[in-house]
Structure formats: C-alpha cells, structure tokens
C-alpha cells in the first residue's frame, strides 16, 4: 500500500505528464494566497447542498489526520468554511481543504498557514440544514474524487490519483522526475528544437 506522503515531493506538473486530463482539476480552484505549501494526502470527499455548509463542518471531526478534505460545494454564493473551521481542521491534523466553492476569513487561514484551495472568498456563511452522507464520491473541479484517492495540490494545480492506480502512477512520476532532473538545458533545447522542426515539416510549414 502506497503512503500518500510519497507523492509530496512530486509536483502536479510532473503528475499531469503521466495522468489523463480528467485527473487534473480545472484552473479555477487555486491556492488562496501566494506561497502556499504543497499538500498530498488521501481524499475525504464531502458534498454540501446549495447554500449549506453542514457536512464540511461535520467532516472536520470525522476525517482521519492526514486527509485532504475535498468539497463539492453547492454554489458560488456562500462560504462553506471560515477561520475557526480551518483552525480546528488544522489542529486535528487535516492536511488541507480543496473546495469547489468559496470560503471566508481567508486572512485567518493564511495567518495559520492552513492550506486552502478554493474558487474564491465571500463573507456570507452558508446554513446548516442538509445532511448528506460523508466520504462518498464527489466531483470537484471537474474531476471525480473517491474516498482514498490521493490528492496533490500546489500553485501549479491539483492532481487526483485514483487509489487503485497509485503505485503505478508513483513509479511513472518518479521516473519522469528523475529523467527531467538529469537532463541539461542544452540537451532539452536540442531535442525540443528537433521535435518542433519535425512537426513543422510534417505540417508543410515553411519559414
């Protein structure tokens, strides 16, 4: 069984090179401030109803330490979490939030260095009316996320590695990172130019 922390030293950029496009979230979900630390951990999926944040507030007491709580929020009008929720999640060992929606009190999360990736910030809180089963598959940033899938997020993007593919993806990504790290810029430029010129030749481009 792969320890999700093994992915912590791999950029989502490297992972994207060995994953399909439907395993990388869309660019609208971003770190909410510059310099946010990369996170990697098993997904604990949460779905919230429109205008409601009950299930994320419940999840912070149920998700195992080290988890990345991945939230399918129901709207882009209300916040699903604020400063205290982020602080409690951090204190309980949650690695971070990835939210297809909005949060509030971003300054508090930033001051505590608790990683939050979301679509933005709004001051209005959601309600607490709708109970939905926790730790079941969700869609976040256009990607299906199941419990235990590995989530890796940083300023480059957010990659989701299906749990069953984790070992194979890790091996491919480590090999890619090693190859890239050993290649000089001169070697890369030479190979890149040859490849581009060959593509242009096939396209009939002259110039």
Regions found by a protein language model. Give the residues of each.
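Feature captures the catalytic cores and cofactor-binding loops of soluble hydro-lyases/lyases
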Residues: 1-147, 161-207
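Acidic/polar active-site rim loop that often engages polyanionic ligands
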Residues: 154
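C-terminal binding/interaction regions
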Residues: 151
């Amino acid at each position: 069984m792969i320890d999700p922390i093994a992915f912590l030293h791999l950029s989502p950029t490297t992972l994207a090179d060995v994953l399909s496009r439907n395993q990388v979230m869309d660019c609208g979900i971003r770190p909410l401030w510059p310099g946010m630390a990369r996170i990697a951990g098993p997904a604990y999926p949460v779905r919230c109803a429109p205008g409601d944040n009950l299930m994320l507030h419940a999840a912070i007491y149920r998700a195992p330490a080290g988890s990345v709580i991945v939230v399918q929020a129901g709207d882009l009008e209300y916040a699903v979490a604020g400063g205290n929720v982020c602080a409690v999640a951090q204190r309980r060992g949650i690695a971070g939030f990835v939210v297809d929606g909005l949060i509030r009190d971003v300054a508090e999360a930033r001051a505590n260095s608790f990683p939050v990736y979301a679509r933005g910030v709004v001051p209005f809180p959601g309600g607490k009316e709708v109970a939905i089963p926790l730790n079941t598959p969700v869609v976040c940033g256009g990607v299906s996320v199941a419990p235990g899938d590995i989530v890796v997020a940083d300023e480059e993007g957010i990659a989701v590695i299906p749990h069953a593919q984790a070992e194979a993806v890790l091996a491919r990504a480590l090999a890619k990172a090693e190859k890239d790290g050993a290649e000089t810029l001169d070697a890369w430029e030479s190979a890149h130019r040859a490849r581009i010129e060959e593509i242009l030749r096939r396209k009939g481009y002259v110039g």
